[in-house]
Amino acid sequence: MLKRLPHAVALALVVCAGMPAGMSACTNSTSTSSSGGDLGVSSILFIQRVTTIVDGSNITIDVAGGNGQVIDYTRYEPGGKLNILSPARADGVVTTLTRQFTTADFNGADVSFDGTQAVFSMMKDSSDRYHIYTVSLTANAQGLFEVHQKTAGDQDDINPIYLPGGRIAFATNQMYTPMGTRADEYEHARIVSQLATISVDGGDADRRLFPQNLSHSVAPFARYDGSFGYSRWEHLGGVNDVKIFAASPGGTNMVAVGGQHGKPCNSLINLHEISPNVMIGVGTERDRTIHAGALVQMDSRNHADPVCLDPSGDYTGHQCLDEEHAQFTVLTPNVPLNADPSPVGRYREPSVLPDGRILTSWADGPVNDLNELAATPPDFGIYVYDPVAHTNQLVYNDRNYWDLNAIAVVPRTEPPIIGDVQHTIASTTPILIGSVNLATTSLDETVSGAQFTSPVPLGVALQGAVAVRIIEGFSSEAAKGITQFGLTMDEGAAVLGTAPVESDGSWLANAPPYIMMHLQPIDKFGLAIRNQRLWIQGAPGEDRRCVGCHASRTGQGVPTMGGVPTVATAQQFTEAIPDRAEYGWPDKIQPLLTEKCAGCHNSSTTSYYSLTRTDPVTGAVTTYNIPTLDLSATPVTVYYDKQVHVYEASYVSLFYPATLAMGMMEGVTITGTVPPEWAIPEDARNSVLISKLNIKAADGTTAFPTSTNPFHPEDQGASYSLTPDERQTLIRTMDLGGQYWSRQNTGFVPYNSDPTAGQQY
C-alpha cells in the first residue's frame, strides 16, 4: 500500500545556502574558468549525475546503466546533486541545494512559475525509490534552503513539472487498476511509467492517476493553455516510436500534439514550448543514443488560421492545434537523427531562455553505444546553442559529472487553470467513445482487398462500415512468463464489443476507464476496413467522442461534440476481464481447425520449406522445417525474433509467411518455396486464407466472386461446412493481430489492491 506523508507536516530538510560573494564555509561551490556571455537571467537550476564511481581501488563506469532507450528512467548512481549557478554565466558560483544527500541521484527538475521554488525527483540511496521533493530557492533567515518531500511509497516518481493552480505533474510506475503495473509491450522487461499529479501543498494526499498507456509516458512539459505535453512510447503492431501528446491536469483529453503523421526521427523527447504549439526538443533514435540527439523544432500550429500564428492572439473559438500537419525543423543538421556515431556530439534536455535562446546540455563524441562499449561516458556540459551559427557557447561544465536539465530561474506567466472533475467521479464510471459520422476523415489513405479489387479512398470505404470493433490492449503484465504473444509484433488483445454504425454514420459505446483501446471499423463481411494505429484511453466519466475516423480538427465547419445530435445510443461494453472476448490460439482456434480442417491439411499432406540459422557466437547451425499448410496441432519448432518457440503446426503454417515478410529474420537462409501469406496480422481482408474461404454477408453478397473463389471447405462436401460464426472467428484472430497467447490461456490473476478505487482519484 502507498505510504503517505501528512501534508500538514511534510518532511522539512535544510541545506546550506550558497552566496555569490562572501561564501560561507559550509557551501559546496565551484567557479568555472571559461569565459562566456550573460544568459540574461540571474540563475539557472541544473542536475548533476554520476558516471564514474570510485570505491577504494575499484572504479566502476556507468554510461547508460541499462537505460539505452530514451524513455528509460531507472539509472541510479550515488553522488548526484541539484545545483544553482548564480550569476548564470561561466564565472558564476555553483551552490548545491542537496548537499546532505551524499548518495542521491536525481531524475528531473523544474522551476515554479514565480521563480521562487523548484521541484525535483530524488532517490536518496540504493534502498530508496525516486520521489518528488520541493525546495525553496531563497535562503531563510538562518541562511538555509528548505526541502519538502511530497511523495513516498513503493514506486518511482520522476520528471516532475509545475502545473497551473498549484499542481505538479510527473511520471510514475505505481501499480493501479486490475492490470497492475504495465510491462512494456516491446521487450516486456521494463516497468512502464504512467502519468500522475499531486498538489504542491498536499503531496500524496492529492495524488491522481491518469489513464494508462501500454508503454512509457515520460518527460512532461507545461503548455500555454494550462494543459501539459509529454513523450509517449507508442507500440501498436508495427508502430514503434516516441511521439508527443498532451493532457489536461485532471487526466482527461489525451490528444496527439505531433509526430503521429510523420517526423524526421523515430523519437521526440524532452520538449519545451517556445510559444503556443511551437516546441523545441530532442529528436533521435529510440535507443542507443544515451537519451541524446539533435535539437528539433516542432510547429503544430494551424497554419490555415492567421489567428493561430499570433503568439499573443486570442484563440477562443479557433482550432489552433494541427498535429496532423506538424512541421519539423532540425536545428542541428550535422547531428544524426538515428543511432549512428555523431561527428559533432549530441544534445540533451533543452529549455528556453526568456529571450528565446536555447539552453541545453551537449556532449562531444559519438554519444551512442560506442561510449558504452569503450566504457567512456560522454561529457555533458551546459551550453547555449546558436541555431544560426550552429555553435555552442559554454555556460558550465564539470567533467566529473553529467550536467543536465538546465532551467532558467526566472518568473514566467502561469497558464490558465483547467477545471478538474475527475476526483468527483467514481473510478469505475465508464468513458464514452464514438463518432458523429464515421465516414468523415482527413486521412489520405486507401483500402484494398476483398470487395475492393482496386484501392479506394478511405472515406469511400468507410461509407460501407456497419460497426466499430473496440479492442483492449495488454502486454506481458497480463500473460506471465510470455515475452511474445506469438509470431506477431502485436500485443495481447481482447474485444470489448462491436458497436453498430447507424444510418447517420454515428456510433457510441461505454467502455472501461484507464485501459488502452484501439478501434477497427468493419464492413458487412466482418472485415476490418482500417486498423487504428494509436492507443486511446479515458478517465472515469470522460467523453472521448470524435467527429469521424480521424476527422480534421481544423478548418471551418468542424462540429463540436455535444452540439451535434446523433442517432446512435451507447452500447455497454464494460464486462469484467474474464468475460471479454479473447482469441488465444490453443483454446479458440485450434479446436476449430482440428475439427474442420486438419483431416485434409496435416503432416501427411503438407510440403515443407526450411529456415537455416547459424549462431553468431557458437557457430552452431540449426535448420527449422516449416510446414506449408498443416492445420493440425502437431508441435513445430520455429525461430522468431532471436528466440526459439514451439507452436502448433496450424499456427506456424498460417502466420510464418507473414512473419518472414516483416524482415526481422537477419542471418537466416530460406530453402524451398515460401507459401503465400495465409494469415496477415491486422489484415484479414488481404489474407490468402480468407480469400480461399470466402465470406457471405447477411444480404447475400460475397467478399470475393464465387466464380473465382468458391466457398471452401464447402466445395469439398457439406460435412466440412464452416458456420458464419466460425468464419468470423478466423477473421477476428487475424484482424486482432494473430496472437497465440491471451490472458485466458496464461493464468492471468488481476491485481486487487487498486488505489484508483478511492474517490480521491
Task: Annotate the PLM regions.
Residues 1-12:
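Bacterial N-terminal signal peptides that target proteins for export
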Residues 2, 16, 156, 216, ...:
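Generic N-terminal simple sequence motifs
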Residues 17-41, 558-566, 761:
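Bacterial Sec-dependent N-terminal signal peptides
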Residues 19, 29, 323, 549, ...:
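General secretory precursor processing signal
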Residues 27-504, 510, 531, 535, ...:
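Sequence signature of WD/YWTD-type beta-propeller architectures
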Residues 41, 77, 445-457, 463-465, ...:
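Aromatic- and Gly/Pro-enriched helix-to-coil junctions and flexible linker segments
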